[in-house]
Amino acid sequence: MYKQPDKEKWTGRIDSESDEKSFRVHQKIRLLDIGQIQTQAENAFALLGFQCDEGVRRNQGRQGAYHAPVEVKKALANLPWHLPSHTILYDVGEITCEGGELENSQKHLGQAVERLICHNITPVVIGGGHETAYGHYLGVRQAVGSETKLGIINIDAHFDMRPYEQGPSSGTMFRQILDEDGNVGYCCLGIQPLGNTAALFETANRYGCTYVLEEELTLATLERAYEIIDDFIQNYDVLMLTLCMDVLSASAAPGVSAPSPFGLDPKIVRALLRYIISKPQTISFDICEVNPLVDENRKTIALAAAFCMEALVHFHRRQRAATGR
């Protein structure tokens, strides 16, 4: 099901009604039915929500991520606008999962992502459970074609490579993708040994996945992480980036399905986002697993909104470096 964008969520402080240097996101956002989009020349981005936590339910996690797209957009609304005035940012609404129809909703998400990419609009997808990533992948693959070598970088505490004989969930997506698509590679950053069984490590190794443990990602070791990322990227024509908020320490992101006591510092995640988005191969981004129902003082929601803004700013900086605008 598709929900058109709603102006009511785009409200906030107004420091000036005329000076664009004082504007906030809610003063610049454009609402657009995804069926009405037209091809853009450059500097166009779209926020697309995926209201779904059926995959989390199937994976025996804490439900509530269904509500995240609306809440993250509300938090984004009041952030300062740090993009050039000519930059276009659309809210194109939400794809929703109703009646437990996960697979159908992922298909519809894929169609929406494909439409954005094919109209030269960079998608920023706001989930939802991490089952969002499978729908995101479907759209990227449809947009770039089956012969394009596609790399997936997942910033996550978990491999999400469980068996799926009983059906897909928020813990199976990357195994599904690797089984279905011979032109895909998978890199996971932030893996928690205590969040993955020995069998899942064996699965990741058997599938030839690249991964970096959480304890190996510090400010002192970021350069080594960048080298690993570069080695991975060089094998692919296109990248999609996905961020699961449970990769962060529970003190920074308590509002997730599976909180992590040994998670990453937000500054590490921010550095990884900036670095990966700076690469010309990266064409889309999703952020998942915010659970507003268990959040503390909207802390996780605010952090997710900040990461979305970081993504937008650094996608634009890369485009500006390439085009001079």
From Swiss-Prot:
Transmembrane helix is among the record's keywords: no
Binding site for Mn(2+) 2: 156, 158, 244, 246
An annotated GO BP: putrescine biosynthetic process from arginine, via agmatine
The reaction(s) this protein catalyses: N-formimidoyl-L-glutamate + H2O = formamide + L-glutamate
EC number, as in UniProt: 3.5.3.8
The protein's annotated pathway: Amino-acid degradation; L-histidine degradation into L-glutamate; L-glutamate from N-formimidoyl-L-glutamate (hydrolase route): step 1/1
Enzyme class: hydrolase
Keyword list, A-Z: Histidine metabolism, Hydrolase, Manganese, Metal-binding
Record text on cofactor binding: Binds 2 manganese ions per subunit.
Residues where Mn(2+) 1 binds: 130, 156, 160, 244
A GO term, aspect molecular function: manganese ion binding
Named cofactor requirement(s): Mn(2+)
UniProt xrefs under Gene3D superfamilies: Ureohydrolase domain
Family, per entry: Belongs to the arginase family.
Record's function text: Catalyzes the conversion of N-formimidoyl-L-glutamate to L-glutamate and formamide.
Protein name in UniProt: Formimidoylglutamase
Organism, as annotated: Geobacillus sp. (strain WCH70)
Organism lineage: Bacteria, Bacillati, Bacillota, Bacilli, Bacillales
Recorded name of the encoding gene: hutG
